[in-house]
Each structure stands twice: as structure tokens, then as C-alpha cells.
Curated annotation (Swiss-Prot):
Protein known as: Protein translocase subunit SecA
Manner of cofactor binding, per the entry note: May bind 1 zinc ion per subunit.
UniProt keywords, alphabetically: ATP-binding, Cell inner membrane, Cell membrane, Cytoplasm, Membrane, Metal-binding, Nucleotide-binding, Protein transport, Translocase, Translocation, Transport, Zinc
SMART domains the UniProt entry points to: SecA_DEAD (SM00957), SecA_PP_bind (SM00958)
Organism: Geobacter sulfurreducens (strain ATCC 51573 / DSM 12127 / PCA)
Amino acid sequence: MFGAIIKKIVGSKNERELKRMWPVVEKINGLESQVAGLTDDQLREKTFEFKERIARGESLESLLPEAFAVCREGGKRALGMRHFDVQLIGGMVLHQGKIAEMKTGEGKTLVATLPAYLNALTGRGVHVVTVNDYLARRDSEWMGRLYRFLGLTVGVIVHGIDDDERRAAYAADITYGTNNEFGFDYLRDNMKFALEDYVQRPFFFSIVDEVDSILIDEARTPLIISGPTEDSTDKYYIIDRIIPHLKKGEVKEVEANTLSGKRKVYTGDFTVDEKARSSSLTEEGVAKVEKLLKIDNLYDPRHMEILHHVNQALRAHALFRRDVDYVVKDGEVIIVDEFTGRLMPGRRWSDGLHQAIEAKEGVEIENENQTLATITFQNYFRMYEKLSGMTGTADTEAEEFHKIYKLEVTVIPTNRPLLRPDFPDVIYKTEREKFNAVIEEIKGCHEKGQPTLVGTISIEKSEVLAEILRKQGIPHNVLNAKQHEREAEIVAQAGRKGMVTIATNMAGRGTDILLGGNPEGLAKQWRRANPDAPEEEYEKVLAEYRTLCAREHDEVVALGGLHIIGTERHESRRIDNQLRGRSGRQGDPGSSRFYLSLEDDLLRIFGSERVSKIMDFLKIEEGEAITHGMITKAIENAQKKVEAHNFEIRKHLIEYDDVMNKQREVIYTQRREILAGQDIRRHFTQMMDDTIEEISSFAIEKVSAHEWDWQSIGEGILKTYGFQIDIPPQTMDRLSPESFRTLLKEKVHEAFDAKVAAFGDELMDHLIKVIMLQTIDAQWKDHLLSIDHLKEGIGLRGYGQKDPKQEYKKEAYQLFMDMMARIAAETVEKIFWVQIAHEEDVERMEEEQQKQARKKMVFNLVDEDETSEPSKSKKLAGRNEPCPCGSGKKYKKCCGK
């Protein structure tokens, strides 16, 4: 209560933040008339003046009012758009390295230009991150007009461009691109063999558009570059054939003489836990599998891999549904994004799950891949000196943004008041009743001409609805999110009179729905259908569409604006809010309502018992609906439960990945130092000394030298350095571990000096560089596999009363130290044994090494829950197209040689 009184007096934290920024807005507004009086050239000259002032030590904060005023004026002249006062506040929040929550239609794309312009003046590069290539290209071209007008350069990173184009884009003052492209470029750079081949600059400032989607929804999604393993795929078909013989059971609680008075009994051959998305064999199931596969003990260490694949096959059959979790298209299993409903070709579940689903569907099974390089989005974006983001829905996840990314969320007020009423949820007992009600609602809106956007959570549900509408003769558009550009066009016209659009929840995000339609979009469609029409005819058509859309706009406003119908609640409240946010932009009228049933996944798995009891208590008959605050509260509690569970998963992932991140930093730093030629000889000398220490460990203190393990010492010296060491008996009597170490060190350094004299300093340094990189890359790849295996089994340590996280840290560190020792031993051994006839031999060796590395590369996005290594593309590149290996070279000059 005391806290509420204080809050009433001084305002909430968000209100205090906004209050602090209004004086700066007044200052910017005070400069507007002065800046408006400048010519275009004088305005552009301001950019160079700001850069000089920064070079002389002036801070960005002191420049902010002037820079924002110049950017605002540039927007008016280059784009015909003026930044509102609330957009100036949004720009300040982003510049401070925070998240700006701005409602749909408030102009987030334009807001980003303010901090991007200001920070680009440092010359250190600003990255603007979007969710897909279409938006990256669109925003770089659209906002690029403003930046170029003010004298800055703009680049865009999209799939399919080569390294030279990427390098040029990153060298620009402001670079647009997707989170995937930025992340993969980082991994690719750290697999290259020359610093001049790197495309990225050191990370400075990043503005992440749709920050909740990228930093939260995709946080469990590591980026992976992988290569195929050699394992046979027959095992997946064999195991898949036994699954139909297993009977699904359930868990029952029976009376028992235990502390709780109950005991769990498992029936059938396997049980399924939908909440945890897991399945497991019962004792009867284990016995049946052993009989079907003709093995004695499924839990024998030799058969653990079989047990793992049986469990994955069970999950494939019991938990993963066709046209919901994935689709089968052209003989391939393609994952459906649970948040957007988009197909994700190329993405694969990992750990044998994707192969199990391929076996279930009877399509060709692709080999599992082995990780060559990986990073999570969480760790990638935390490398930026300053990180900020914007979205329409961040406040519900404010705690996670703060705990994981140290990012504060500031809610920016809307430019005009929000007029959209969000009607209470309507709940039915069955899905059939719910769909009947949804169809009636759509029909009513369509008949009076009110545009309707219907949100579904899966492709399957959108197709069911579309089929019913088709049978009833109601014209509609269906968005299954297969093509971003087409998707944006359909969404842009969803506000036309009488339009019915069915879309998976997040499809078309980033595109405003204009009431009455978008005349430019309609004219663009006409231009595509009539490419040879003269320009004056196009202008005439555009003018007609503008008149039509203006008339329809007024009619749609009178009808109540865009009506949103949600057909199911998502696990996250934020996704529901995003759907609602498609309506009521910039003070437009609109409305929203969700239709639910007890058969919906969220209610069935997490909350149906309580809701069902309420409905029974209220004696709800079939066909009747209920609208009640208690029900809405129960649904919100179910959503909060799921959100908390998902937050724990993401937190758990980052705690484990932080261990890996430190190791990645060590390896990548060492690689960069080697590529830069920094202290290569010192690195190698340290490696030699490490191997000397290893061999000298056989010389034991307080034991006569005659009793040392001379066989192991001799084998170690011969294997590592290629020579033998003879010690006379009289010297042996006086030998101590320390004097032996000194003697061995002298001999090894003498042999190395002789090698340098024979090869020459320059060739030797080049050789060390090539062999070090080759060895580091090979050992790092194997280390990543070892870490994957460690992660898979570490949870079992909990049964031994040990903390799995601490055990993981300890063992991962030991694996890392073992890898570093192997890198040293292997590098030294190769240098001492290598024979070079000509300098060209080293160059050939380097070329072959690079070619092999490129051939192995497959670029993957992986969902960490089941997660994935996407498959190699089946499409062959043309000889002059960029090589699909990602090298940045043309195919004919790379893998097509």
C-alpha cells in the first residue's frame, strides 16, 4: 500500500523516465525552425561538422539535440516524413541502449533513423537488425534515402551476396541485415585463413527491430555451421518400424504405503508428457523393444545409442504432428515456426529427431551433421558495446530483458490515443462450436463490409478455417507465410472494405495495415501485371487507387475499423498482444476478440481442469459460450506458467552456453592473433615447451633416473620431434628431473633452429601459421562434439546428488585443457616431421585446407529445445553464382573447380 502511495506521488519508473526526456524534446523542437532554414547542402554539411566535433572529443549526448533536429529535417526533405515528439523520445531511449516499446503503426522504422544517424557519426558502424531479408532490403532502401541525403553510407546484408559485397556493406556507416546473417558472418569470419578475408568490423552499436522475436523467441536457437557425419541412416528406418507395435499408456496414482500415500503406476509400453514434450518407455516397453530388436539389455552401455533413437522415434510419433509442427513438401520434412507459422526450409531438429520424423513420414533420411562452429543469439548480441531494441510488445518480458541482456524497457506513449476495444474472451466446450462461432462472426463483419483479420496458431487450423469459408462462398486470403514479399502485400491490403484475411499469428509482421488499403501496393501489383505499360498510364492508375482507397478508408472507419479475431490463445501473452496490435494503429478505430475452446492446446494441457469445473458449475450447455472474468484469469495464469517455464529454459541455456562462450573467445582470439602474425614464433615456442613438460613428467622426483620409464620417454621424443636422445650411463647417475628437462629443451630447440635454418624464417613462420590454424580448427570441431555429448548426459548427475551445472563447468574446463594440450602436441609434431621441397608446397597445403573447410560447411539454425542442424541445399549453384559453401567466391572458383 505504501508503495502505491509513493507511486501515485512520484509516478512509475516509466513515467519518471519520460518526464526526464521531455526537456530534450523541447530543445530539439526549438532548433526546428533554425534547421529548416538551411539549404540541402548546408544540412548535409552538418554531418561533417558533427564528425569533426566528435573527433575533437565532444560527446554524443551533447550533440544529440542538434543531430536529432538535423535528422528530423532530413526526414521531411528525403522521405516526406516528420518525426513526432514521441518518436524523438523513442530515439533517445534507443541511443541510451534500452528497449523502446512502441505500439504497431507508431513508426518504429523511422524512429531507428535518429539513434542510427547519431551513432554513425562516430565512424564505427551501426547495425540495424530485422527479422527477414525482405524487411532488411526494404528498410535499407527506404530509410537509406534519408541517410544518403545527409551524407552517410548505407549497406544491406542479405542471403546470397558474396564476401566482397558483405565487406562493403559492413564498411558502410549504417548496415541493415537479419540476425541470422550477422551471426553467420561472425562464425564464418572465425573460420577464415586470412584477416583480409574477414567481412565484419568490431561490434559497436546494434538496433534490433522486433527485439522480442529475436532476443526471446529465438534465444533457444543457436546458429550452427556444421559438416555431415558418415553414419548410416538404416538404423532410423529399423527403429521406426517397431514403434507401431508399442502401445501408448498413461501414469496413474494408486494408494500406497508411502509418505504421500500415493504411488505412480505406468501402464502400456510408453508414456507421453505433453507439457515437457517428452516420452519414455515403461518396463513393459523396454522388454518389448529388446524382443523386437533382438538385444539382451537396452540399458547396456553398448546400446545407449539405440535407446536414445527409440526415445526420439517415440517423440516423432507421439508429439510431432504433420501440418502443425512440420509439413512434408517435395519429399522433405520442413519445420513450421511455432511463433510465426512460417515454413523454415533448411532448419533441422538435432539429436536424431529430424531423422526420426523423416523415417516416420517415409521420406529420404539425411545424415546428422557435426558442429564446426556455433553461437547463440544471446551471446552474439551481448558482444556489442551498446545494444538496443524496439518492438510493440516488450513489457511482459521486461524481467528477462533485464536479467539476461541488462536491457531496460521504456514504454513510449502513442502519438494519438488508442481507440481499440479488446472484447472479453468467448469460451466454448468444443473446437467445433468455437469454429462455428468464428465463422458467424466473420460472416457478419463481411456482410456489413468491415475488414477482418483472423489469427490462427498453426497452418493446419488456418486451412480448416479457409476450407469452411470457401464452402460458404466467403472470399478470403490465406497467409501461410511462405514468402515474405507476397506476405507483406497481402497484409498491407487487409484493411480494405469487406476483406477477410486468415494469417498465422505473426505473419506479415513489420507491415502496416492501412484502413481502406494501400494505393502504392495496389499500383505495384498492377505494374507487375502490366510491365510494358507507359509511365503516364501507371500514374493514372495510382491516382485512381488513391481515390478508391481514400473513399474506402472513410467507409471502413465508419464501420469500426479492422476487427481482429483470435482463434486460440498462444502460450505467450505477448504473441496475443501482437495480433491485437495489428488493429487500432495511429488512433484508427478497431476491435479484437478471442474465441477459445476447452480442446485448445493451451487449455487442454495447462488449464482445462479448472476452466472445465467453472463451466460445469455454471451449467454451460453445448453450443453456449461463456464470457467471464474468472475464465480469463485462469487462462492468463496458464500463460504465465508457460512463460515462466520457457524463461527458465532460456536462463538454463545461457548458463551452460556461457561456459562454451569463454572457450570460444579464447580460441577465436588465438586464431585472430595467428592470422595477424602476432607472436607466431612465441606461440609455437610455448607449445614446444608444453610438450617438453609433458614428456618430462615421466622423469619422477626422488626416483633414480635408471628407474624412469625410458621406453615412454624415448617413444614420446621420437613421435613428437623425430629424433632420439642418447644419455651415457655415467650421465644417467647424475640426472635429475630438472637437469633432464633442461637437456631435452636444449636438444629440441637445437633441432628447431636447424629446421628454421633449412627453411628460412619467412617460410617457417608461414608453415607454423598454416599448421596451427589447421590443428586448431580440427581440434575445436572435435571439442564441440565432446561438449555436445557432455551436455546430453550431464543431467543424470543429479541422480548422484551432484549439481549438473557445476559438474558441467568442471568437466567442460578439463575437456578444454585437454584440447589445448592436443593442439600443442599435434602442431609441434607436424612442424618437426614436415618435409618441404618447395615454397609452393605450403601454398598448395593451405589452398587444400581452405577448400576442405569450405566443402564441409553447412549453415544451420537450430531450435535448442529439439535443436537442429539444417541440411545441405539440393540446388546446384550456377558457375557464376556465389558458392553455396559460403566462402564468398564464385562457384567456379571454389567448390566447382
